[in-house]
Amino acid sequence: MKKLIVLTGAGISAESGLATFRDSGGLWEGYQVEDVATPEAWRKNQELVLEFYNQRRKAALEAKPTRGHAILAELQNYFDVIIITQNVDDLHERAGSRNVVHLHGSLFESRSTLDPTLTYKIEGWELNRGDKCERGSQLRPNIVWFGEAVPMMETAAQIAATSDIFLIVGTSLVVYPAARLIDYVPDQIKKYV
């Protein structure tokens, strides 16, 4: 079976009603990105950051996968599909996709502020102040914030390099380093944007 690697972005989930940062004139659900999606925001106001992500998680739980999500899942019948998504929702998985790499993390996981390798599933939609890891540090959303390194980038680059077909859906390729993934795809491989 040919290996189909799919890079997805916010555009595939937007039809589900989930807000996207790029389409909101610099505001993200009414917030400046600097106030809710940076390490500095976390240090300044953990309550605000937690509430922001709790609301995003709640919205994601209420959203339904789009036809685009379903089509990508159906392609598993014909290809060895790996989805590399910039999205932090779980709509690909709920549509039936089995092999999804979340480049920027997941709304449905938390991680230790002391040890980022300690990650935990979030049951329900709330992560609160006082929720701690086994080592006693506050849990934060397991999301890559602006200004942070992308831990899954090397894995994603290795996957992109193995593709027989590379498909890009719902992203304008302006968010780095994800936009650079296409550079890892061998020159002779078909790329569809």
Predicted stretch roles:
Residues 1-193:
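Conserved catalytic core of sirtuin-type NAD+-dependent deacylases
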